[in-house]
Amino acid sequence: MGVLDNKVAVVTGVGSGIGKAISLAFAKEGASLGVGDIDVNLLSKTTEEIKKNTESVNSLKTDVSSEEEVKKLIDETVNKYGKLDIIVNNVSVAIGGYPITDMSNEEWQKIIAINFSSVFYGCKHSIPFLKKNNGGSIINIASVQAHTPLPGWAAYAGIKGGVISMTKNLASEFGPFNIRANTISPGTIATEMVNQVVEEDGTGTLLDDFILMHPLGRIGKPSEIAATAVYLASDGGAFASGADFRVDGGLVITPRTRPGVGSHSKKND
Protein backbone atom coordinates (compact mmCIF):
# COMPACT_ATOMS: atom_id res chain seq x y z
CA MET A 1 0.00 0.00 0.00
CA GLY A 2 1.32 3.41 -0.98
CA VAL A 3 0.28 6.83 0.27
CA LEU A 4 -0.76 7.78 -3.28
CA ASP A 5 -2.81 4.69 -4.10
CA ASN A 6 -5.79 5.52 -6.34
CA LYS A 7 -4.49 9.02 -7.02
CA VAL A 8 -3.75 10.45 -10.46
CA ALA A 9 -0.90 12.90 -10.95
CA VAL A 10 0.56 14.95 -13.79
CA VAL A 11 4.27 15.80 -13.55
CA THR A 12 6.19 17.93 -16.05
CA GLY A 13 9.90 17.89 -16.77
CA VAL A 14 10.39 14.24 -15.83
CA GLY A 15 13.35 13.59 -18.11
CA SER A 16 15.90 14.30 -15.42
CA GLY A 17 16.59 15.83 -12.03
CA ILE A 18 13.78 16.83 -9.69
CA GLY A 19 10.94 16.01 -12.07
CA LYS A 20 12.27 12.52 -12.67
CA ALA A 21 12.71 11.91 -8.95
CA ILE A 22 9.17 13.10 -8.21
CA SER A 23 7.61 10.92 -10.90
CA LEU A 24 9.49 7.83 -9.69
CA ALA A 25 8.57 8.52 -6.07
CA PHE A 26 4.90 8.98 -7.00
CA ALA A 27 4.94 5.69 -8.92
CA LYS A 28 6.44 3.85 -5.95
CA GLU A 29 3.66 5.25 -3.77
CA GLY A 30 0.95 3.92 -6.08
CA ALA A 31 -0.07 6.91 -8.21
CA SER A 32 -1.19 6.70 -11.81
CA LEU A 33 0.83 9.18 -13.82
CA GLY A 34 0.74 11.54 -16.75
CA VAL A 35 4.33 12.59 -17.45
CA GLY A 36 5.84 14.99 -19.94
CA ASP A 37 9.21 16.28 -21.10
CA ILE A 38 10.48 18.05 -24.20
CA ASP A 39 13.32 15.52 -24.63
CA VAL A 40 11.71 12.35 -25.97
CA ASN A 41 14.75 10.17 -25.28
CA LEU A 42 14.95 11.17 -21.61
CA LEU A 43 11.16 10.93 -21.35
CA SER A 44 11.27 7.38 -22.69
CA LYS A 45 13.97 6.37 -20.20
CA THR A 46 12.05 7.79 -17.25
CA THR A 47 8.84 6.13 -18.44
CA GLU A 48 10.58 2.75 -18.52
CA GLU A 49 11.81 3.29 -14.96
CA ILE A 50 8.31 4.25 -13.85
CA LYS A 51 6.98 1.02 -15.35
CA LYS A 52 9.12 -0.96 -12.92
CA ASN A 53 6.61 0.16 -10.27
CA THR A 54 3.41 0.70 -12.24
CA GLU A 55 2.01 0.25 -15.73
CA SER A 56 -0.33 3.17 -15.09
CA VAL A 57 1.63 5.85 -16.91
CA ASN A 58 0.70 8.15 -19.79
CA SER A 59 3.81 9.60 -21.41
CA LEU A 60 3.69 12.56 -23.80
CA LYS A 61 6.33 14.84 -25.35
CA THR A 62 5.57 18.23 -23.82
CA ASP A 63 7.01 21.67 -24.42
CA VAL A 64 5.78 23.49 -21.32
CA SER A 65 6.16 26.88 -23.00
CA SER A 66 3.21 25.83 -25.18
CA GLU A 67 -0.20 26.15 -23.53
CA GLU A 68 -1.64 23.71 -26.05
CA GLU A 69 0.89 21.00 -25.17
CA VAL A 70 0.46 21.42 -21.40
CA LYS A 71 -3.31 21.22 -21.81
CA LYS A 72 -2.96 18.12 -23.97
CA LEU A 73 -0.88 16.32 -21.33
CA ILE A 74 -3.47 17.08 -18.66
CA ASP A 75 -6.46 16.23 -20.86
CA GLU A 76 -4.99 12.93 -22.06
CA THR A 77 -4.17 11.89 -18.50
CA VAL A 78 -7.71 12.62 -17.32
CA ASN A 79 -9.19 10.84 -20.34
CA LYS A 80 -7.10 7.76 -19.56
CA TYR A 81 -7.58 7.60 -15.79
CA GLY A 82 -10.88 9.42 -15.30
CA LYS A 83 -9.75 12.13 -12.90
CA LEU A 84 -6.91 14.31 -11.65
CA ASP A 85 -5.72 14.61 -8.04
CA ILE A 86 -2.26 16.18 -8.32
CA ILE A 87 -0.38 18.54 -10.63
CA VAL A 88 3.36 19.16 -10.32
CA ASN A 89 4.68 22.06 -12.39
CA ASN A 90 8.39 21.44 -12.31
CA VAL A 91 10.22 22.62 -15.44
CA SER A 92 12.85 25.37 -15.12
CA VAL A 93 15.66 26.77 -17.20
CA ALA A 94 18.67 28.45 -15.56
CA ILE A 95 19.64 31.64 -17.36
CA GLY A 96 21.78 34.04 -15.37
CA GLY A 97 25.08 34.49 -13.63
CA TYR A 98 25.46 38.00 -15.04
CA PRO A 99 23.72 41.37 -14.53
CA ILE A 100 20.29 41.91 -16.06
CA THR A 101 21.82 44.80 -17.99
CA ASP A 102 23.51 42.13 -20.11
CA MET A 103 20.40 39.96 -20.53
CA SER A 104 18.80 39.95 -23.96
CA ASN A 105 15.06 40.25 -24.40
CA GLU A 106 15.13 36.81 -26.03
CA GLU A 107 16.64 35.32 -22.86
CA TRP A 108 14.12 37.15 -20.68
CA GLN A 109 11.18 35.92 -22.73
CA LYS A 110 12.55 32.37 -22.56
CA ILE A 111 12.73 32.48 -18.76
CA ILE A 112 9.17 33.82 -18.57
CA ALA A 113 7.84 31.17 -20.95
CA ILE A 114 9.49 28.15 -19.33
CA ASN A 115 9.69 29.15 -15.66
CA PHE A 116 6.47 31.12 -15.22
CA SER A 117 3.99 30.76 -18.08
CA SER A 118 4.33 26.98 -17.85
CA VAL A 119 3.17 27.09 -14.23
CA PHE A 120 0.25 29.30 -15.20
CA TYR A 121 -0.77 26.87 -17.95
CA GLY A 122 -0.50 23.85 -15.67
CA CYS A 123 -2.62 25.46 -12.97
CA LYS A 124 -5.15 26.93 -15.41
CA HIS A 125 -5.90 23.62 -17.10
CA SER A 126 -5.71 21.35 -14.06
CA ILE A 127 -7.93 23.34 -11.69
CA PRO A 128 -11.22 22.53 -13.50
CA PHE A 129 -10.47 18.81 -13.10
CA LEU A 130 -9.41 19.25 -9.47
CA LYS A 131 -12.69 21.06 -8.76
CA LYS A 132 -14.63 18.27 -10.45
CA ASN A 133 -12.72 15.80 -8.27
CA ASN A 134 -13.74 17.69 -5.11
CA GLY A 135 -10.19 18.76 -4.43
CA GLY A 136 -6.56 18.00 -5.02
CA SER A 137 -3.01 19.23 -4.70
CA ILE A 138 -1.09 21.77 -6.78
CA ILE A 139 2.68 21.61 -6.30
CA ASN A 140 4.78 24.26 -8.02
CA ILE A 141 8.57 24.09 -7.92
CA ALA A 142 10.05 27.49 -7.05
CA SER A 143 13.58 28.20 -5.78
CA VAL A 144 15.44 29.31 -2.69
CA GLN A 145 16.68 32.19 -4.83
CA ALA A 146 13.29 33.81 -4.37
CA HIS A 147 14.26 34.23 -0.69
CA THR A 148 17.93 35.15 -0.67
CA PRO A 149 19.87 37.32 -3.13
CA LEU A 150 22.57 35.95 -5.37
CA PRO A 151 24.13 38.54 -7.69
CA GLY A 152 23.64 37.75 -11.34
CA TRP A 153 20.34 35.92 -10.87
CA ALA A 154 17.80 38.74 -10.46
CA ALA A 155 15.62 37.67 -13.40
CA TYR A 156 15.50 34.02 -12.34
CA ALA A 157 14.83 34.94 -8.70
CA GLY A 158 12.12 37.42 -9.61
CA ILE A 159 10.19 34.87 -11.63
CA LYS A 160 10.48 32.21 -8.93
CA GLY A 161 9.14 34.79 -6.47
CA GLY A 162 6.24 35.26 -8.84
CA VAL A 163 5.57 31.51 -8.78
CA ILE A 164 5.38 31.60 -4.98
CA SER A 165 3.05 34.61 -4.97
CA MET A 166 0.74 33.13 -7.60
CA THR A 167 0.59 29.83 -5.74
CA LYS A 168 -0.41 31.52 -2.48
CA ASN A 169 -3.19 33.34 -4.29
CA LEU A 170 -4.40 30.08 -5.82
CA ALA A 171 -4.48 28.51 -2.35
CA SER A 172 -6.70 31.33 -1.13
CA GLU A 173 -8.97 31.43 -4.16
CA PHE A 174 -9.52 27.70 -4.59
CA GLY A 175 -9.24 26.54 -1.00
CA PRO A 176 -13.05 26.50 -0.71
CA PHE A 177 -13.02 23.79 -3.39
CA ASN A 178 -10.63 21.70 -1.25
CA ILE A 179 -7.77 22.47 -3.62
CA ARG A 180 -4.42 22.90 -1.90
CA ALA A 181 -1.60 24.84 -3.52
CA ASN A 182 1.99 24.92 -2.30
CA THR A 183 5.48 25.59 -3.58
CA ILE A 184 8.73 23.80 -2.92
CA SER A 185 11.85 25.98 -2.95
CA PRO A 186 14.92 23.79 -3.39
CA GLY A 187 18.41 24.91 -2.49
CA THR A 188 21.24 23.76 -4.74
CA ILE A 189 20.33 20.26 -5.90
CA ALA A 190 22.49 17.76 -7.79
CA THR A 191 20.75 18.05 -11.14
CA GLU A 192 21.73 18.47 -14.76
CA MET A 193 20.65 22.12 -14.57
CA VAL A 194 23.08 22.82 -11.73
CA ASN A 195 25.81 20.94 -13.61
CA GLN A 196 25.19 23.23 -16.57
CA VAL A 197 25.45 26.37 -14.43
CA VAL A 198 28.71 25.13 -12.89
CA GLU A 199 30.15 24.28 -16.30
CA GLU A 200 29.18 27.62 -17.83
CA ASP A 201 30.66 29.51 -14.87
CA GLY A 202 34.11 28.35 -15.89
CA THR A 203 35.90 29.20 -12.63
CA GLY A 204 36.19 25.63 -11.42
CA THR A 205 35.16 26.69 -7.91
CA LEU A 206 31.40 27.30 -8.22
CA LEU A 207 30.32 23.88 -6.93
CA ASP A 208 32.49 24.32 -3.83
CA ASP A 209 31.01 27.80 -3.40
CA PHE A 210 27.50 26.35 -3.59
CA ILE A 211 28.37 23.79 -0.93
CA LEU A 212 29.70 26.52 1.38
CA MET A 213 26.41 28.39 1.07
CA HIS A 214 24.57 25.50 2.76
CA PRO A 215 25.10 25.08 6.52
CA LEU A 216 24.63 21.32 6.13
CA GLY A 217 27.83 21.32 4.09
CA ARG A 218 26.51 19.66 0.96
CA ILE A 219 24.11 20.16 -1.91
CA GLY A 220 20.80 18.34 -1.96
CA LYS A 221 19.53 15.27 -3.78
CA PRO A 222 16.53 15.20 -6.15
CA SER A 223 15.05 12.45 -3.97
CA GLU A 224 14.91 14.89 -1.05
CA ILE A 225 12.71 17.23 -3.06
CA ALA A 226 10.61 14.27 -4.18
CA ALA A 227 9.99 13.25 -0.57
CA THR A 228 8.50 16.68 0.13
CA ALA A 229 6.35 16.43 -3.00
CA VAL A 230 5.01 13.04 -1.87
CA TYR A 231 3.99 14.57 1.46
CA LEU A 232 2.21 17.49 -0.22
CA ALA A 233 0.47 15.17 -2.68
CA SER A 234 -0.69 12.72 -0.01
CA ASP A 235 -3.45 12.82 2.58
CA GLY A 236 -0.72 13.40 5.14
CA GLY A 237 -0.41 16.92 3.75
CA ALA A 238 -4.16 17.51 3.65
CA PHE A 239 -3.99 20.64 5.85
CA ALA A 240 -0.95 22.17 4.16
CA SER A 241 -1.84 24.95 1.74
CA GLY A 242 -0.53 28.35 0.73
CA ALA A 243 2.93 27.51 2.04
CA ASP A 244 6.41 27.55 0.58
CA PHE A 245 8.44 24.54 1.68
CA ARG A 246 12.13 25.40 1.63
CA VAL A 247 14.28 22.31 1.17
CA ASP A 248 17.57 24.13 1.11
CA GLY A 249 20.00 22.68 3.63
CA GLY A 250 19.58 25.82 5.74
CA LEU A 251 20.80 28.22 3.06
CA VAL A 252 18.20 30.91 3.74
CA ILE A 253 18.81 31.07 7.48
CA THR A 254 22.54 31.53 6.93
CA PRO A 255 22.85 33.27 3.56
CA ARG A 256 26.33 33.34 2.12
CA THR A 257 26.71 35.27 -1.10
CA ARG A 258 29.43 34.07 -3.40
CA PRO A 259 31.96 36.88 -3.94
CA GLY A 260 32.13 38.12 -7.49
CA VAL A 261 29.05 36.43 -8.91
CA GLY A 262 27.33 38.91 -11.17
CA SER A 263 30.20 41.38 -11.02
CA HIS A 264 31.39 40.52 -14.50
CA SER A 265 29.83 41.49 -17.80
CA LYS A 266 28.40 38.74 -19.94
CA LYS A 267 29.39 40.68 -23.04
CA ASN A 268 33.05 40.63 -22.01
CA ASP A 269 33.21 36.88 -21.36
Where in this protein do the model-derived segments appear?
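Alpha-helical segment proximal to the catalytic Tyr-Lys
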Residues: P128, S172-P176, A238
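Conserved glycine-rich cofactor-binding loop
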Residues: V8, G15-G17
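C-terminal substrate-recognition "lid" of short-chain dehydrogenase/reductases
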Residues: F120, R218-V247, V252
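Substrate-binding pocket helix/loop in short-chain dehydrogenase/reductase
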Residues: Y98-I100, E107-I112, F210
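Residue(s) in the substrate-gating loop at a strand-loop-helix junction
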Residues: S143
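Short C-terminal tail/terminal secondary-structure segment
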Residues: G97, S241-D269
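Active-site helix of classical SDR
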Residues: C123, I159, T167
